[in-house]
Amino acid sequence: MNTEATHDQNEALTTGARLRNAREQLGLSQQAVAERLCLKVSTVRDIEEDKAPADLASTFLRGYIRSYARLVHIPEEELLPGLEKQAPLRAAKVAPMQSFSLGKRRKKRDGWLMTFTWLVLFVVIGLSGAWWWQDHKAQQEEITTMADQSSAELSSNSEQGQSVPLNTSTTTDPATTSTPPASVDTTATNTQTPAVTAPAPAVDPQQNAVVSPSQANVDTAATPAPTATTTPDGAAPLPTDQAGVTTPAADPNALVMNFTADCWLEVTDATGKKLFSGMQRKDGNLNLTGQAPYKLKIGAPAAVQIQYQGKPVDLSRFIRTNQVARLTLNAEQSPAQ
């Protein structure tokens, strides 16, 4: 009967009261239990008063009660009914996983961003290519028109050049009619001064071309053949022949161009006169003089080297852009666009 009464009394007590009674029977304080279980004194007090801390999960609370029961030698099976009431198991609230959906949404947004970026890049590349093609096509058309104009000018100049000998033949007739009296005088002077006429054969080919009509007139004046060969012009025309042999002074405004490849070129001076317009071949040289400033149009700036007033002209800005060079060379050698 005493055993049954004790069992009924234990069932009437709560879990916290049974743990407190067992602790007091063993002579332990709450501080000693807290130190052995590595818990706070407040946690031990809450367990004995059957309080469930709000910040403590039920799983941890059930574990603390079991450890407390083993410490005070109370079987765990006797405490299970009380544990279900004091610390019932509560399902933890788990937030729905959103990482996958967030990652999917972020990936979709990144996909749109990359698509827009590639679209902008393709548009920029397309516009750049169209601009380059239009500029290149315009340059080619301009070079073609310049070449056509130069060919037309060259053809007109060649037609005018063919009619020049007809005019020169008419102008030389009075000269031939007026030379016989002069030939008589030259024969007389040549007989008196043979030493003066000795260096006459050393004259340049251009002088020989001019003297040939007078020599023909000397032959028609019934003079002997030896005297005709030793009497080119006499003593009087000798200073003019020597003046023709002397080289003229170099023009300070001379424009010298050397070509490393085929290049179309047009040069105009200050008076509007075209000093040159046409195509220059590789390894060609061109020396032009006129009234400064000069206006130049060069189809291939990389194929020509220009010297003005003895100094090279910088064409690097036209070579870098690969454009037709349009520049003006002033008297101070300052090329301007």
Swiss-Prot record:
Single GO term (MF): DNA binding
Record-annotated membrane-spanning stretches: 112-132
Residue stretches of biased makeup (Low complexity): 168-207, 219-237
Membrane-topology annotation of the record: Single-pass type II membrane protein
Keyword Transmembrane helix on entry: yes
Positions on the Cytoplasmic side per record topology: 1-111
Region (Disordered): 145-237
Residue span(s) of domain HTH cro/C1-type: 19-71
Subcellular localization(s) per the UniProt record: Cell inner membrane
Biological process, per Gene Ontology: regulation of cell shape
Record family assignment: Belongs to the RodZ family.
Function: Cytoskeletal protein that is involved in cell-shape control through regulation of the length of the long axis.
Entry remark concerning the domains of this protein: The helix-turn-helix (HTH) motif in the cytoplasmic domain of the N-terminus is involved in the formation of spirals to maintain the rigid rod shape. As this protein is anchored in the cytoplasmic membrane, the HTH motif may contribute to protein-protein interactions to form the RodZ helix, which is localized beneath the cytoplasmic membrane. The C-terminal domain may be critical for determination of the rod shape by probably interacting with enzymes required for synthesis of the peptidoglycan layer, including PBPs in the periplasm.
Name of this chain's protein: Cytoskeleton protein RodZ
Species this protein is from: Escherichia coli (strain 55989 / EAEC)
Gene of this entry: rodZ
